[in-house]
Amino acid sequence: MIKKRFISLSALIVLLLVITGCGKDDDVQEVIYEKGLPKEDSPAFKEFMRYELGLARDATLSYQDHTYTIMRSDVDGLRYYQYTDEELRDFYSPLFSAKKDLSHTLYDLQTTEFLNKEKLIQNKIEHNLPEMTLDKKNVLNVKTKSGEKKIELPSARGKKVILALEAVRKDNMLIQVIINGKTGDSQTYYLFIKQDLSKHQLVKEDGLHTTLESGKLKDYLSVFPKVTEDGAYLKLFDNYIFEEETNKVRKIKDTDILSEDGKYVYINGAKQEENFVISDGIQQIQTVDNYLKGNKKYEAQFKLDFKNISNEMGFKTPGVSSASIHYFNEDYVVLSLSYHGVMVGTAGSVNVLIDLQKNKKQPTAYLVDLGIE
């Protein structure tokens, strides 16, 4: 009798687990598919355009009163620019008026100079931006409103030095220093320096994490963007987060993707199956806080179906040949999908623009070929 009760109870538990599991999956809704671009502009689309036009890849030093201040650094030197939301939106507005060949329209925008001389900041000091110069011996001279400071760079004499201002705050600055040798070798340093020029610290790139964890850079932490309002987490370079409470550098898994702003994680967003294809089905996004705590709280959950997307596009195909996340930021995800032809070749390609601004449980996915691979 006891044995029968035990078997019955076990069967009931298994049944409840199955029902509960199915229920959770059933609660996750598939995205709403729409062909073409969004009908109107939005803050999240604007940030996506900044990325596509190469503006977000430059160091964004500030965004205030609808105005961006950015730094661009290359072999020609270091320059500062300012542009407004309105100027940016006017620049990419042809995308919304184009009736066809959107990929060509985007390409034309990408190959047209947006950062012209009119947007160049001439008086750096007045804009609270440092002037940085190198003498013939590659000694760095930094000039701010507080004065000037000369800093000798290690093993830089006779080599090509590239400077990049990564961040500027009220109290601190962060300068990237790349020293290129004549034989093709290079060494990257990070120069942390006080705005009043009272002190500085130079750290090798490969020693940045250990130096952070040692506490030696405690006075300079403001140069790293806050991931959370309380500053419990700070965004470092690449897929790394600094946790202030534990004084530890945390790494986002290689199979997951950190958003451009460093605040969200796309679970398994970089976990590609065979032939460079990420999985469709349930997609999950967490805040960095929840991700690092290891819980199951999700900021967004929704379903994607690659077959349904091909049907919407009218592709005759046995399935996807490649599928990857091209762009991920707060409230916006952009995928690049390519489909096999029935026998050989390609049936077609499409970009999927998932807009999470209004609905994170059933977002709208815009299907459009922007030529983004």
List each model region and its residues.
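N-terminal "mature head" segments of proteins
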Residues: A11, L15-L153, G158
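Hydrophilic extracytoplasmic domains
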Residues: K24-V28, E40-T60, G269-E373
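Repetitive beta-architecture junctions, highlighting loop-to-beta-strand starts
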Residues: L78, E86, D135-L140, S186-Y190, ...
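Structural signature of eukaryotic scaffold interfaces centered on beta-propeller domains
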Residues: P43, Y51-G54, T60-S62, Q110-E126, ...
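Short coil turn/linker residues within repeat-based beta-strand modules
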Residues: V139, T144-K149, D196-K199, T246, ...
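Recurrent small/Gly-Pro-centered beta-turn motifs in extracellular repeat architectures
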Residues: K124, L129-T133, I175-I179, N268-G269, ...
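Acidic, serine/threonine- and glycine-rich low-complexity intrinsically disordered segments
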Residues: G158-V320
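Bacterial N-terminal signal peptides that target proteins for export
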Residues: I2-L9
